[in-house]
Each structure stands twice: as C-alpha cells, then as structure tokens.
Amino acid sequence: MGDAELAVFGSAAPYLRKTEKERLEDQTRPFDLKKDVFVPDDKEEFVKAKIISREGGKITAETEHGKTVTVKEDQVLQQNPPKFDKIEDMAMLTFLHEPAVLYNLKDRYAAWMIYTYSGLFCVTINPYKWLPVYTAEVVAAYRGKKRSEAPPHIFSISDNAYQYMLTDRENQSILITGESGAGKTVNTKRVIQYFAVIAAIGDRSKKDQTSGKGTLEDQIIEANPALEAFGNAKTVRNDNSSRFGKFIRIHFGATGKLASADIETYLLEKSRVIFQLKAERDYHIFYQILSNKKPELLDMLLITNNPYDYAFISQGETTVASIDDAEELMATDNAFDVLGFTSEEKNSMYKLTGAIMHFGNMKFKQKQREEQAEPDGTEEADKSAYLMGLNSADLLKGLCHPRVKVGNEYVTKGQNVQQVAYAKGALAKAVYERMFNWMVARINATLETKQPRQYFIGVLDIAGFEIFDFNSFEQLCINFTNEKLQQFFNHHMFVLEQEEYKKEGIEWEFIDFGMDLQACIDLIEKPMGIMSILEEECMFPKATDMTFKAKLFDNHLGKSSNFQKPRNIKGKPEAHFSLIHYAGTVDYNILGWLQKNKDPLNETVVDLYKKSSLKMLSNLFANYLGADAPIEKGKGKAKKGSSFQTVSALHRENLNKLMTNLRSTHPHFVRCIIPNETKSPGVIDNPLVMHQLRCNGVLEGIRICRKGFPNRILYGDFRQRYRILNPAAIPEGQFIDSRKGAEKLLSSLDIDHNQYRFGHTKVFFKAGLLGLLEEMRDERLSRIITRIQAQSRGVLARMEFKKLLERRDSLLIIQWNIRAFMGVKNWPWMKLYFKIKPLLKSAETEKEMATMKEEFARLKEALEKSEARRKELEEKMVSLLQEKNDLQLQVQAEQDNLADAEERCDQLIKNKIQLEAKVKEMTERLEDEEEMNAELTAKKRKLEDECSELKRDIDDLELTLAKVEKEKHATENKVKNLTEEMAGLDEIIAKLTKEKKALQEAHQQALDDLQAEEDKVNTLTKAKVKLEQHVDDLEGSLEQEKKVRMDLERAKRKLEGDLKLTQESIMDLENDKQQLDERLKKKDFELNALNARIEDEQALGSQLQKKLKELQARIEELEEELEAERTARAKVEKLRSDLSRELEEISERLEEAGGATSVQIEMNKKREAEFQKMKRDLEEATLQHEATAAALRKKHADSVAELGEQIDNLQRVKQKLEKEKSEFKLELDDVTSNMEQIIKAKANLEKMCRTLEDQMNEHRSKAEETQRSVNDLTSQRAKLQTENGELSRQLDEKEALISQLTRGKLTYTQQLEDLKRQLEEEVKAKNALAHALQSARHDCDLLREQYEEETEAKAELQRVLSKANSEVAQWRTKYETDAIQRTEELEEAKKKLAQRLQDAEEAVEAVNAKCSSLEKTKHRLQNEIEDLMVDVERSNAAAAALDKKQRNFDKILAEWKQKYEESQSELESSQKEARSLSTELFKLKNAYEESLEHLETFKRENKNLQEEISDLTEQLGSSGKTIHELEKVRKQLEAEKLELQSALEEAEASLEHEEGKILRAQLEFNQIKAEIERKLAEKDEEMEQAKRNHLRVVDSLQTSLDAETRSRNEALRVKKKMEGDLNEMEIQLSHANRMAAEAQKQVKSLQSLLKDTQIQLDDAVRANDDLKENIAIVERRNNLLQAELEELRAVVEQTERSRKLAEQELIETSERVQLLHSQNTSLINQKKKMDADLSQLQTEVEEAVQECRDAEEKAKKAITDAAMMAEELKKEQDTSAHLERMKKNMEQTIKDLQHRLDEAEQIALKGGKKQLQKLEARVRELENELEVEQKRNAESIKGMRKSERRIKELTYQTEEDRKNLLRLQDLVDKLQLKVKAYKRQAEEAEEQANTNLSKFRKVQHELDEAEERADIAESQVNKLRAKSRDIGTKGLNEE
C-alpha cells in the first residue's frame, strides 16, 4: 500500500503504517548481519550490540550505549535485516526470537503504531494518550478490507470477523486479554462501536422513528457506561480498570444486519466493595452518586457528598484526574434510560448502592465481660434498613444474634465483633454482586429482540495471566482460565498452520501443541485435582487451609511435574505450593481459600432480605438456599447440590460454557500490553513488556511458529527479489515459470536445502533462512553498486577531460581571432568599414518600415473584414449552441434510460445469483438428506436386530418367571435385594420413557425443520446427532437389561424361600414386563414411522432433484439471455461513448468557431446530422434493450412462480406426512415384509451372480478368441520372418528363428495383447480427434461465414449511413434557402432512415435464418462424418493386406535406393578432396557435433531395425497412426502400378549391373561380420535374427565403411600436403566449395520440385473446398435475394416520393460498380503478381539453400526442409485463403449491388431498367468466370494427385539422401581434428596479424593527422607571412 492508498485513512495514516520515504530510509541504513546482534542485559533484558571479537566460545561485543560486554556465544541472538524494521506481522521476521519481537514492538510504539500482528495475534500497546485512529473516517477505510490489505488495527480484526461470519456462515469470536491497564476495555468498546456502525448502515430510517428507548445499536453501545459504572474502578495501573470479565455476544441476521446481543460476566471482584488499597478506589458508581450532579439522589439515599464519611469507599483515593464523576453519572443515568430501565429499577439500584455505603458505617462494640457484640449506635443501621426496606432492629439482631440450625432445632448464636464485621462485609459484597448480575440480566433482556438471528460475534474481555508476589485463590482462577484459553489458541493456531501446509502441499507431521498445557489443566480441574480437593475440603466442617495443603502435597507432590514445593524468600509473602504454568512458575498462598470458596452468608439476614419491602432486594435473594435449607422428598439431592455450589465449581461451570462457545466459533486473538507502570506515553519498560509477552502467549505462539516454516513468499515476489543472487539460473530471454525459477534459484545457492519447502503458490522458509538470503542479496548488491560506481566515475572523469580539451581548443581559437583583429584594427580600410556599416543598416531599416506600414494597412483592412465575419459566426454559433444543448438534453435522457436499463439488468443478475445460491443450497440439502437417509436405514436395520434380541430376551424372561413361581424359600434380605434391583429397572424404564419423549421431540423437530427450508441442513444434522445419541443410549439400556436378566437367573437359584413374597414380586415383574412390551411396541411403531418418513423424504428428494434440474435449465436459459443482454448493452454503451466523444469534439469545434471558416460550419452541420442519425439508432437500441429486459423480467417472474409452486408442493408433502403418520403406526408387518424383500433381494443377487458367471464365461470365450487371434498374428509374424529369410537366402537362420519364436511364444502373446489394446485405444482416440477436428473446422467455417455476413451487414449499414449523410447535406443546403422546405425534407429523410433501419433489422433476421440453415447443414455433415468413420473402420480391416503390399513396395524402393546409393557413392568419390579440404570451422564444428548425434541415432536405428519381432509389434501399434497415409498409398498404388512395372524393368537391368559390386562388397562384409557378431553377441537371439534380416542395410554400411577406409588414406595424404603448403590448401578449399555447391544442386532441385507440387496440391484442395462453400453460399444468398425482391416490390408506392433521390443514388451506384469492377480486376492482377512473387520467393529460397557450403549442414537442412516447406505452404495457403475471401467479398459486393439495383429498379421504375440489365449481365459474366475457375480447380485436383505420387517418390529419395549424408560424417572425423588445429593456428596468426595491422593503421592514422595538422599550420604561417608582407609594403607605400 503506497502513500496514495494510505490517504483514505486521513489523519490516522502516520499512526498506522510507515511512509514510503521512511521505509526506504530504514532499508538503506548500514547493517552487518554477522556483527549486529542482541545480547542479554540485566536491566533492559536485551540490548543491541556489535560483535568485536570471538574467542573460545565467547563473544565480545559493544552495546549501543557504548558498553563492552563478553557473553557466551549461545546467548547472542542475531538482528533482523533493515527490511524487517517495524514489520507489521512479527511472524514474518526471519530471526524469530524474544529480542526481535521486543524491539519490533518498541520501534513501532515509538512511531505511535500501537497495533502489530504476531501470526494469529494482534498485539496492541496502550499509548496512554489519545490517537486519531478511531474516527468515522478510519471505520469507513477498514470496512470490507482483508487483513493483508490494510495496516494492523482492531477495526481490521473486527471487519475480518464480520466478513468471515457472512461468507463462511460461522460464528466468530474476538478474544481480548491482557493485564489491568493494557487497554482491554477500550479495545472492546472499539469493537462494539465498529459492529454497531457497519451493521446498522442502511437502517437509518428506524433510528428516526424510535422513542427515547433508543435503537438496538444505541443500546449495545450504551451498555458499556452502565457496566463500567458498576464494574470498573481505579487501580494502581489503570484509572478505568474492568474488575470483571465479560463475553459479549452480538447477534446478526442472515444478511449481516444487527439482530440482538447478550452479555455474560465472569469473576467480579467482590472484595473491592469493602476494601481498597491506598492508590485505588471503589467502583465508580459510589463516587458518581456523591458528585452531587443529581442532588435528589443524595436526599433519596440519605447521604452527603463527602466520600470520607463512608468507610467502605474511602480507604484509598476518592478522585481521579482523568474521570469526571459528575458527567459519568449523567452518562450512566442516560444509559439506563436508553436501555429501557424503569424509574423504579433505577431508584432501587441507587438505594441498594447507598445502603451498602451506610452498611459500612455500622459500628459494633464488645459487651462488657462477654465475647458478644452489640450495636454501637443505630443511626446508620436505620438508614441502611430504610433503604433496603427492612426493620432496623431485626437487621441488627440478625447480625449480632443469628439463628443457626442444630439438628432439627434453631438456636440463637452469639457473635463477636470480628465475626459481625465479617458478616457485614460478606452481606454487602453479596448484595452488590447479585445487583450487578441482575443488571447484566436486565441489559440482556433489553438487548434480546424478536428479530431473526443467524450468527453471532462474541467479544471476550478478560484479565490476562497474573504473577504477583502474593497470589491467592483469585489468581488461580484467572490463571486457570488463561491456561485453558492458551491451550485453545495453541490448538487453533497450529491447526490453521497445518491447513496452510496441507493446502500448499507441504509434507508435515502433525504436532498437537494444545496438549503441551494439558498436564497443568488436568492438575487443576481433573478429579483429585486442586479444585476437586478444595471442594472436598469445603464439605468437611473441621477442614482448614492446612489440611487442604496436606492433601495437595499427598496427592501431587512428586507425582505431577507441574506441582512443586515453593522456595520461600525473605521479604516476600509466604507461599504454600507452586504451579508451572505456560507463562511461568507461580507461587500460591492458600490462606482463606476454604472461606473464599464457600463464601458463607449470615442466613438470618438473608431471610430478612427475602422479605424486604424493596422488590429488587427480595428478588435478588429469592432463589438463595442455605446449607441448612429443608430437603424436599424425592428432590433433595438436586436441591442440596444447587445450594452448596462453591465458587470454584461455579467458575469451572462458567469456564466450560465459555470454552464450548469459543470452540463453536472461529476465534480472533487480541493481546493488550501495558508499556510501563508510570502511565507515560511513548515509554517502553523492557522487562515489563517481556513478562507480558510470556504471560499472554505471544512468545508461545512464536515457539510454535519456529517449529514450522514461519516465513513464506509468493513465487513471483521471491523470483523478483532474489533473482539477483544468481541471474544465470533464470535467463532473461526465455520464459520460465515462477515456481520453476524459484526452484532453480534455490538449488543453485549454497544453502541448507532442508530449510525450505515448495508449496503450490509459495516457497516456505525456516526461521533465519530468509535473513541469510537477505545478507547474500545485500552483498551481491554492494558488489554490483561498487562496479557501477567505478564505471560511472570513469565516465564522468572522461567527460570532464573531454570538456577540458574542448575548452582548450576554444581558447586557442579565441586567442587567434583576437590576435588577428589586433593586427588589422588600425588598418584604414577597416576603419572606413566600421564607419559605413551602421549607415547601411539605417537605409535597410527605412525600407522595412515602409513595407511594414503597407502591411499594417492591409492587415487592418483584413481585421475589419474578419471582425464582421466573426460577428456573423458568433450569431450562427449561438444558434448552434442552442441546438447542441437540445441534443445534450436528448442524449442525457437517453443516458438516463440506459442507466435505468442497466439497473434492471443488475437486478436481474442479482436475482440470478440468488437463484444460483438457492439451487446450490437445495442441492447440498438433498445430499445431506440422502446421507441421513442411508444412515437412518442402517440404524433401522440395527434397531430391528436389537428388537428381535429384545423379544428373545422377553421370552427368556417369561420362562424365568415361570420357573420363579416354583421357587419359594428365600430370606427377606434376598427379597429386599430383588426389590432394589427392581427399583433399578424402574430407573431404566424411566430412562427409556425419557428417550422415547426425546425421540418424539426429535421427530417433531424434524417436521418443524421441514417447514423452514433455510434451517433444514443444520436441524437435520442436529437430529442425526440426537438419533445417534439415542441409539447409543438404547444400546446401553439393552446391556443393562441383559445384566438384569443374568442377575435374575442367579437370583432364581437363591429364591427358594418364601412363596408369598416371591409371588408378589412375580406380579410386579409381570406388570413391568407388560410395560416393557408396550414400550417396545411403541418403539417399533416409531421406528416404522421413521422409516416411512425416510422413504417419503427420499421421494421428496427425487422430486426436488427433478425440480433442481428444471431450475438449472431455466438458469442456463436466463444466462444465455443475460449474455445477449450484455452484448446489446455493450453495443449501446459503445454507441453512447461514440456519441459522447462526438459531442465533445463538436463542443471543442464550437469553442474554436471564432476563427472557423465556412467549411468548418458545414462540418459541424454534418456532425449534427450524424448525431441525429445516431440518436435515432440509440433510441431503437434502447427500445430493443427494454424489450429484452421485459422478457427477462417475465422469465424471472415465471421462475419465481415456479419456486412458489415448489414451496406449495413441499407444504402439501408436509401435510401428507402428517396424515400418513397415524396410518404408518399400525403397519407392524413391515418387518416380515422387509424379510421377504431381503429374501427376494437374495434371489436377485443369486440371479445376478449367475448372469455374472455367464458374462465371465463370455469374457473367457472372448479371451480364447483373442488368444486365437494372437496365434494368427504369431503365425503371420512367422510367415513374415520366413519371407525375410527367403529374401536374405539364409535358410538355416530361418529355422533357428522359427524355433526361437516358438520358445518366446508365451511372452509375445502377452505383449501382443497389450499392443492390441493400445492399438484400439489409439484408434479410438484418433477417431475422436479426427471427429473433433472436423467438427471444429466445420464450426470455424460457419463462424467465418457468419463473421463475413456480419461484416457485409456492417458495410451495408455503413453505406446506408454514408447515403444518409449525403441526404443530410442536400437537406442542409435546402434548409439554408428555405427553412420550411428543409423541415419537410428532414421529416421525409427521417421516415426514409426508419425504413432503412427496418430493412437492416430484416437483414438481421435473414442472417438468423442463415444460422439455422447452417445448423441443419452442420447436422447433415455430422451424419456424413459418421458414415466416413464407418469407412475408416472398413479400411482398418484392409490394413493387413495393405501392409503386405507396402512391404513389397518397400522392396522395390530399397532396390532403387541401392541404385541411388551407388550413384551417390560415385558422386562422393569425386567430391572427397573437396570435403576433406573443407575448413569452414564454425559451420563444420556445429555440423560435426550434430552428425555425431545422428550417427548414434543411426546406429540405434540399425539395432532397433534388427529386432524384427519388436518391429512387427511396433508396426501393429503404429498402424493405427498410419491408417490415413495407407489409404492414400492404396489409392496411389493403384494409379502407379503401371509406372512401377516399367520401373521394375529398368531396375532389373540396373540390378544385373550392380550384382558384381554387391559380390565385392560381400567379401568385405564377411571380414567385418565377425566384429559385428561380437558386438551383437551380448544381445538376445532376437537381435541375431534381426541382424540377418537386414543384410542389405549392413551391405550399405559396408560400402560406407569401404568409403571411410579410402577417405582415411586420402586424409593422411592430405594431412602431409596441408602441412607443406597452407596457402595452396585455401585455394583448393574454395574450389572444393564450389564443387560442393554444384553437387547439392541436384538435391535442391528435387526439394524445390517437392515444394512446388506440395503447394499446388494444398492450393487445389483448399480452392476446391472454398468453391464448394461459395456455391452453397451463393445459392442461399440467391434464395434470400429473391425473397427480398418480392418484398421490395410491395413497397413501390411508398418509394415513389424518393424517385429523384434514387436517380442520384443510381448514378452513384453505377460509379461504385465500375469502381468495384476495377478493384476486382486489380485484385486479379494482384493475385497473379503474388503468384509471380511466390515463384520468385521459391527461386530465392533455392538460391539461399545453394549458398550453403557445409555438406553436413545441408544434410540436416534436407531433413528439416519438409517442415520449412510445410510452414511456407501454410503461409501460401493463408494468402490463397485471403485472396479467396477477398474474392468472396467481391462476389458478395456484387450480390449486394444487384440487390441495390433491384431496389433502384423499383424506385426508378422505367428509368433504372437499363442499368439493372447491365448489372445482371455483369453478374452472369462473373458466374461464367466462376465456372471457369471451377474447371481450373478440377484440373488442379488432377495435377494434385500426380504431384502426390511425385512427392512420395521425392520423400523416399530425400530420406536416402539424409542417410547417405549421415554416413559421410565419419569420413571427415580425423580430418576435422587436424583442420581444427590448423585453423586454430591460422586464427591465432590472423588475430596477431589483425592486432598488428590495427596498431599500424592507428599509428598511420595518427601520422596522417599530424601531417595534415602540420600542412595546415604551414599554410597558415605562409598566409600570415604573405599578409604581413602586404601590410608592410602598403605601409611603406603610404609613407
């Protein structure tokens, strides 16, 4: 974000982010990564220092304060590079440690940037002064910004939470923690302010209508003053410290609108009510009341305005400088009003507050000679009792003589003064705490609105970790809370980190850091933990703090690593045990913990409170039950537990609720830091800040970050910044992907490659590696800058020296001129010249003055004329301006209409998006319902099984009961045991009843959820969870019943006692059995109903899916219509922009009209007419746009109606479900039917198994057929091998091949199957690609035709526009003469233009008709393509036969190749000397390297060719690829059969001639054969057989080897000759080059012939296709023209009035026809010229090829010439296609002209018939030319076929040329080495000669310059001498 983007933050910008200048200054400061470090310091924790020396594991460094220190090397931590100074996210620091974090916060705080990110944290430091960063301008700037798009701020955290809530549909929470005074409360208020502002935007109208109660936003904001008044107080660190924790939930609707809010509070500091330290004070409300701002309060509460009159609130300070208690009282009272408190409620709260103050003033004294207390005055007690609505005497009696319960009786107990004082304080604290809780509940009731709410954002404001010298029970609760929150953060943080790694594809082993704190948490909250032991001790009356300590040590000391025995230090409070928290070790003092945990009250006084006449007080204590409260029968257990709930248990319960809330939300973390204890702005106390960083988990988060990869950079940014480290890794000229570039760059650097990972979009670094890269980058930059500086200094010095030389030369010239002037200034003629010169100028001046006067008169006259002209123009300009204003008004109206249309279009788009969202949501719901249905079906089956088991259990139970009837004798104790067991059964039955009700509620809930479709997904998920829980409970109950049955069986053996008692128990058991039966039946009914419901929901789901498909189809239609609407709108927008541009141009021209001429006025009028035309076009486009929008609206209304119908259907389905519910309850036979269905399904499965077996047998038969086909292929392969053996005349080797193939049969069978499968896949892919290619070509042709038609329509419209312009010009001339006549003509022209626009629309409709006909043609062509595919399959069947023919053809070609090779060898022998003497080093070097590669390739090809079996399989695999080529060859072979027969006859003659040579080569081959066999012996027997099958190839190799031997001998001879005379070699080289160039002409001529024939072939094919298309287009256009002609004849009468105008147009049309005719002829000439240029280019290409001197490079080019020719052919085809398109355009133009002529014929009636006949004759001529062209194309097709055959021959010849040229590479092998050496020597000598020559030339040049200067100087001297002599003689003569 640059400085310009920061401007949106206004005055807050400097407090949020550094400016660009500051960032540059920080980055350019001096820095040394190896020396700049942090060292530990006793006072400052860490200080910056520079390393001086290293020695023996220790480092000596100088701190920034100038102090020299020596520390261990492992204590030194590196500083971060300047790039990271004041970084906004500390997780991005490359060196992530404590001092780096501390100093980053310190530097940002010094710049007043108080917010900083630390990974997931936002750390904020209290500035202790007001900063302008919370204004409305800042709120608006942060709204909708992502975290990365704006500087750190609490508003950014808030907005991200709000946006996540809306987008992710998930509840959010913001956790704000920190010590007192760190700014938690302020930040909480800012968060609430932000939500109230952004969520209430757009709802302002309600604010104006609300009464004094205030809007919801106001109430949420005003809740803070009320809470602060009763819950905040001044502390040592903070003047407005919150003494309670709070969790504020702000609820929002589905659209993000504020719905409601509620507040939960934690750990209110009750002790502050009665006790404060010296520097602190009580809660604000006490001092606000005493401020006397509302005197009526003082009277009502019976108090003064002096705080020191009241003991409870005057123990510390009573005033705070930064707080105005009077104003705060008014704010509190106003908050109560806004929150809707009644006057009675406000007064009751004030009364209780005043009563507490009076409570503290009540005094008691000890009775004489007794230990009992008595009141010391009753005045304060009377006031307190009055305010509380109590009796004063009863209050005092209850305090001094409380009644306690002893046994079943109440007795009065005496209290001493200390006990009374404690009871008094406890009662005051209880009253205040309950009043505070009531106020919070009352605020929640106000904020609870009836508006629908979907999500909430929770704001947690709670105290941070506390480690004091004296830590008590309150600190344990706070620290336990923070331990849980830190565990929550750790788990959440690393889960997100892991998700980032997973998303980026980083391999990572999960580490659950949340478990790090589990040991400490378990120690506190688990059974037998600290809290549990504390609560246990509170239950024992004789327990003390010391017994509590003893239990702690017995259970945990030595057993838990987190529990330790403290070390007591003198001067510090005593500690009883220590806990190791994540923030550090805390020593706790347990004194008073039991009392604090029980928090007892004087129950006598509490009973008085319950009976108070003050309604609020009685309500506060109405639900209080003391420890001795009566226990009601049957419910005593619950009552007792609730009454004796300890503080620790209540805190744990609230904490668990809080953690549950937080786990269900997406959390955001804010950590508040207090910078110093003195509240000084801008001062950082390092130890204090470090302590808080440890306590609030920032450093813990850093520890987690260091385990992973904390630094990450996008690939593009990394490449851009660090490419300088190794530019060679990422070359500048070529494109390399950013990720690949980063990988190459990092792999090329000398760094640990385990320190980074590559993700999908980023590169991840371990901590410290990025700093190392920065250091390397700085070093690299310093070297580069040093080099640049040196070069720059050199350039500057040379420039300065050049200036000095130029200055010297200038001085010399000036000196020479001055000397010359001094020599001639006294010369008499010169003096005369000085006198006459001014006179000459004065005469010239007079002449100039005369001419200027004449010019002035003439200009004055012209000025008067121009002035008159200007006035005339001004008058005209006024009228034009008026017209322009009218036009602007019209344009504005059109723009308004367009804006309305755009708004409607936007609305349609929004509706479409909403529909898409609904469709998506419904799809998701359907998927969830299907999943639920599947799960419920499975559960249903499971429950059915369980029901059957239960039935069996019941049967067993009946048998057991029958046996029990016979068992009589048992003791009464056994009967009692049985009774207890039956009571357990009662409980089980009660549980089952509850579960049944829960199931019914879940069922009803599911039905309700069906009504509300928006909540269906969530409610179904909840119902699923509930059902799973119920199923688990049922399983548990079944297990219990099984246990009961076992117990009963055991009891059966024992129950042989009393028959009467057992009979009674039997009766009870029978009743229980009946009840269980009834419940099980009901359970069955319910399960059946659920199953029916599931089936209905499945049916409903299928219906919804159908509806969804219909909606999707409708949405697609809407999208297509919207796309059309967008295109129309784009056209209108373009037209509007053109109009605006034209309007601006007219305005500019009108402004410059003062100097305009009549031509400019005409232009303005012309533009005006164009505006009229465009305005009418815009109006028509707008009407069309509105019609389209109306259609879209109609379709949208239809879709909405359909959705409504769907909702109605759903309602009907719901009613149907409710009706069928009762019917399905009676269907008990479903289980049996299900069994029958299962049996049927089993039978079906057996049938399916049989069918599968049949299919398997069919597949086996197919496999056998495949095996037979493989065997056939194997036999064919053997046959081919036999043929090869016969051709090579080696029968013995053939027999070995057959035996070898027999052994490899099994292996090749599998290979053939694989290859056959690959062949089928490739054939399918090829067919699909061919089909797609044809379709694409056809579509392309259609699109091209449509484009051409649109272009023609556009040209037609342009012609109409130009015609309209000419008509406007005529009307304008008429308007100047006669305004009335001009008006009529304009009206007629308007009608004419309207008619023409209508014609254009009809033309568009005709184009649409063409499109439909093209679509039909497309379908027809697709059918043809399918037929062609059938033909292709047939051709595949003939592939085997063609393969055999191809091999025979290959034999013939091989013989011709052999003949060509022999002729080529003869040619080579004549060129040996030329090639051996070739010394063109650079070309030979490249060609030699390439030739080596080709040689290796050739050898590999020989080896591959020798593998005959693999060749055969490869041919099978590649046959699919060459199907089309084989088809062409098949056609060519039939045509070339006769030619080949004649060629065979010639070949036989040549073969006889070559047999002798073959025999000689055979002898030499036998010698080399042994060596080849030795090389091939390592291969398989397959290689041996293949070698024999290719003897002819080996023969050719033998000839090449022979040539190589001869060339080697020749090379030795040439070597000696070259050593003798290098100059003679160069002469021979040039001669050899010429010979080589001539030798290559034959190859090039063949290539040129191939090129020409290929071009002709492709041109003919393309021309044929184009002609076919043209014929179809012409036919369709003729039909359209005939239809249009009939329509035009109907409007003859309407066009009669424009006959004169039509005559003029006819003349213009005839001229255009002539012009187009001339253009057509010129295009034909141009085509011929281009053909000539093409042939010339071909000849130039041939000449360029002939200039190639290197034989090897020529061979390479011979191989690649085919591709080059194909490219050139493509270019020429494009040119031809372009010419054909031009031709079609001309034909279309002719058709258009014919159409125009028909039009003109109807307009002109008789006058235009002759012209029409001429045009028709011209059209017929063009048609004749078209026929001639078609005949030519037919002839070219015939020539094309001949050329194809010739191309094939040339292709084979070219391939042989390539192979021969490759063989030649070995011939120059050793020669090149010598040539290189000689060439190198020659180059060195030449280089030395060039050097000497350049030196000589330089000296020669300097000598010539010196001679020239000497000559010039000498000539000057001679001239001067001559002049001096002349002057001397003249002086003598004068004397």
From Swiss-Prot:
Region (Disordered): 1907-1935
Function: Myosins are actin-based motor molecules with ATPase activity essential for muscle contraction. Forms regular bipolar thick filaments that, together with actin thin filaments, constitute the fundamental contractile unit of skeletal and cardiac muscle.
Ranges of residues in domain Myosin N-terminal SH3-like: 32-81
Organism: Equus caballus
Coiled coil start-end: 839-1935
InterPro entries, per database record: IQ_motif_EF-hand-BS, Kinesin_motor_dom_sf, Myosin_head_motor_dom-like, Myosin_N, Myosin_S1_N, Myosin_tail, P-loop_NTPase, XRCC4-like_C
Alphabetical GO biological process terms: adult heart development; cardiac muscle contraction; muscle filament sliding
Sequence ranges assigned to domain IQ in this UniProt record: 781-810
Keywords: Actin-binding, ATP-binding, Calmodulin-binding, Coiled coil, Cytoplasm, Methylation, Motor protein, Muscle protein, Myosin, Nucleotide-binding, Phosphoprotein, Thick filament
Quaternary context: Muscle myosin is a hexameric protein that consists of 2 heavy chain subunits (MHC), 2 alkali light chain subunits (MLC) and 2 regulatory light chain subunits (MLC-2). Interacts with ECPAS. Interacts (via C-terminus) with LRRC39.
Record's protein name: Myosin-7
